[in-house]
Amino acid sequence: MNREQLKQELVEHYRWLRQNGNNDSHSGNASFRFHDEIWITPTGCCADTLMPEDLVCCHINGDKEEGASLDANLHIQVYQQNIDAKSVIHSHGPHAIALTLNGDDFVPVDFEGQYYFPHVPVISIPYEQYIEQAPEAVA
């Protein structure tokens, strides 16, 4: 896929999060890597009205254009630390949030869940350290 096709794909998937109740209209963010470019949702964007041309370009070296998501540094770190990562989707799904509220790790009870995700740790990272610690935790 070329850059423009990937931008369209990212916007569609970001909208689907909202349409399927896995994100509210203005929280979370998403990005994809295209060579040394990282295209990310703008800070405060609305999933319902986001267009491919609204995505903001950042670079693997850490440079960011104005308007990039407040979590752009986190996305950049994920790509720097995991060269196989092609996309990052960060949502605030109500079910995922509810599962983490007691602080226990999530262990699926169904066969398929156990097969694909036998153990999903709940990771607590202080806000001031999340850019440094989160990329390693999800790698």
Per-region residue spans from a language model:
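Glycine-rich flexible loops
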Residues: 1-139
